[in-house]
Amino acid sequence: MAGQTIIVSGLNPAAILQSTIGGGASPTAAAAENGTRKVIPLSRDALQDFMLSIITQKLQDEKQPFYVLDLGEVVSLIDQWKSALPNIRPFYAVKCNPEPSFLSILSAMGSNFDCASRAEIEYVLSLGISPDRIVFANPCKPESDIIFAAKVGVNLTTYDSEDEVYKIRKHHPKSELLLRIKPMFDGNARCPMGPKYGALPEEVEPLLRAAQAARLTVSGVSFHIGSGDADSNAYLGAIAAAKEVFETAAKLGMSKMTVLDVGGGFTSGHQFTTAAVAVRSALKQHFDDQPELTIIAEPGRFFAETAFTLATTIIGKRVRGELREYWINDGLYGSMNCVLYDHATVNATPLAVLSNRTNVTCGGSKTFPTTVFGPTCDALDTVLRDYQLPELQVNDWLVFPNMGAYTKAAGSNFNGFNTSAIVTHLAYAYPS
């Protein structure tokens, strides 16, 4: 790995990483400058020390929350994807987390991008990414966004209604279309997509005919089984349904479909392993006769979730008997909005930099039933209840792992707490 070149926003830190790995330098001794961005090479178990160095060196006065993005984790996840689904091109769902350094390394490692709005397209293009690496994967778009896509050359989009056909015919007739279908089984996902998007079986032929009458090219089919812990078996039925759409288009005399978009719903770990097996099996069963088929996907949380760690400061404390109540400087109106909108469960680890510097993780310490509140004035802003934590003090820190998916991207500035201002620090942790 030491000889591999990693590009981050035009940065090539390979030589500096080599000096750390091969030259015996301390984990934080080498940094690659790129404007105001640095990439710190680390061993896998040095991330905690890196966060402590940020806290002690940079945040003495203003103890603001911050993220650490582990680019090594991103590279590992991309390698896992290529190994498990080598014939499926990932189009990363920008809405999940648009951190620019994150997008840059995804791009450098070969990922393309799923954008849902003009703003997301503009953002991706601003990083120097070609428009032919973007799918405009929003089945219902404002006309102004369609006009913009035509102007900049984003020529692949999704639809699931006749009105969308009319808008595209009027403003972007050169665009190729993917018919978004609704899977009959959403996989019991935390965030199902079916109630809002996707053509029903009886709507497929009329929608194909509408595009045909408008002289638009329908290049293929897309679907999304839903986001977060979805049952991988949902891919089986969805891919079978997609094959039926291909066959219907052929019966209508339409041009041969060449693209299948299997959507998102992938989560790193065991779920991804089982999902990859299901997808490969279904593709072999239904599309083995089309070796020229281009297969794409729209993973978001698979790449983002485990790559980001959030560090927050304890700004307030209250003791009520055995109960410990802490206030931190991020919450449900900020990064932890995922608890409400993504139905996520967050976990906290202490960094007792003030009260227990010799044992910052408080290993072996007595724990107490704990409530953790966010900083806003809304009582809804409660991050954790009935959680076990050791005794902590104001200006100690709580660290939240796996905070890359639908966190900062969906945060607000409610009560003046500016989620968009939270800084992301870059590290590259090599496998142990």
From Swiss-Prot:
Gene3D superfamilies: Alanine racemase, Lyase, Ornithine Decarboxylase, Chain A, domain 1
Catalytic activity annotation: L-ornithine + H(+) = putrescine + CO2
Known partners and oligomeric status: Homodimer. Only the dimer is catalytically active, as the active sites are constructed of residues from both monomers.
A Pfam family matched in the record: Orn_DAP_Arg_deC
Cofactor(s) needed by this chain: pyridoxal 5'-phosphate
Positions annotated to bind pyridoxal 5'-phosphate: S227, G265, E298, P299, G300, R301, Y406
Listed PROSITE patterns: ODR_DC_2_1, ODR_DC_2_2
Superkingdom of this protein's organism: Eukaryota
Gene Ontology terms: biological process: alkaloid metabolic process; nicotine biosynthetic process; polyamine biosynthetic process; putrescine biosynthetic process from arginine, via ornithine; response to wounding; tyramine biosynthetic process
Encoding gene per record: ODC1A
A GO molecular function held by the record: ornithine decarboxylase activity
Site (Stacks against the aromatic ring of pyridoxal phosphate and stabilizes reaction intermediates): H224
Keyword Ubl conjugation (UniProt): no
Listed name of the protein: Ornithine decarboxylase 1A, chloroplastic
Modified residues (N6-(pyridoxal phosphate)lysine): K95
Pathway it works in: Alkaloid biosynthesis; nicotine biosynthesis; Amine and polyamine biosynthesis; putrescine biosynthesis via L-ornithine pathway; putrescine from L-ornithine: step 1/1
One GO CC term, this protein: cytoplasm
